[in-house]
Amino acid sequence: MRHLSVPTDRAQDIIEIIRGYDWQSSEYRIHQIEQDKIVIPLTAEVPDTLPENIIGDIVFIDPIPNPQNHGSWKEIFEKEIGQEMVSKLDDRLSRGHEIIGDIMIQPAHRFDDSRPDYVDVLVRAKMKTHPRIRLTLFDYGVKGKFRVRDLEVAAVRLDRIVQGDELQEIPAELLSSETTIKESGLHIHLDPREVYYSGKLENERIETTRKLLDFRDEINRPLAICDLYCGVGPNLVHLFPHHGLTGPILANDLNPACIPYLFRNLPPLKSLSFLEINGILQVTEDIQIANMDALVLASDRNQHGRWDVLFVNLPHDSLEHLPHLIPLLRKDTPSIIRGWSILPTSELSTLSDRLFSILRNRSSHSDISFKVRKQYGATKSMVGFWIRIRPE
């Protein structure tokens, strides 16, 4: 069977390109054949002559099938280690995992001594249940001022599932946590160890796009969109396929690790070389990219009164930041704020009043709606809200 042989130091980049073309066979495994080379199984649709951006050689070798699904992870776990151990798993280990691209993220906690064998059995059982998972990461919570996940490699799938001390012998390139998300046919590149991303908001992004299309039709022109907490750009990625939806765009994030991904994820920037950005930079006629504190950026009078749509996705602090962001919106035409917030469930009944209070002198011209999206822990809720402000 045809495989693409590539150097391990270019493996992740080439894998992403191959997947972008839908040329990787899902029935067989990517595996290592030499210390510095891996092979990627190819579908029958792959042409004999590959595009110039794909580095490697086509080779003919026997494929290694992906394992068949052996049942639920609990069934596999119980078979290997005993039914009683399932009930003994602590809260973080028994909590559901999350899949981001070809990566599984498993909530866990650090052990003072060596990790118990049953933890590796748990990871192995889940990877057997999900044969397309390449890498599993332990999730120890969040860290740092950018609140990115504190992640550690738990296992990698090569010709077999590699765990524990054996991971030290694996080339770093094969342990890369960079991955590609597919949302509604769109591709979003990211590294969950470096940047924040929530796949749970995909439906929110679809809803946002639909409503902004209606808003565009109402005001009869492309929308000027300001996303001050853009991350790697998932909200914006959903907008670009719709011709005439977006006009000027300001995409900002405080985390510098997000900026290179904006150049890979936003279609108008993909043909550009990545630019180091310190502050704010006009990178195309319509797009500004910024790497700075959102409140500092919002205080720039050059940005005031310019934007039709404001995204506010800083759930733990959205309501505290919002009063400082209102001046960014246009006053001569309708404008929209699309935001998300995490707040105590007991405060949901007063959320509309709080938002009206934040709007101050523009509150009489505003319409507010919100929906509870999910529970966040025992006492809090994630809320998505819309504010429509009529012209003054």
Protein language model regions, located:
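SAM-dependent transferase fold signal centered on methyltransferase-like domains
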Residues: 1-392
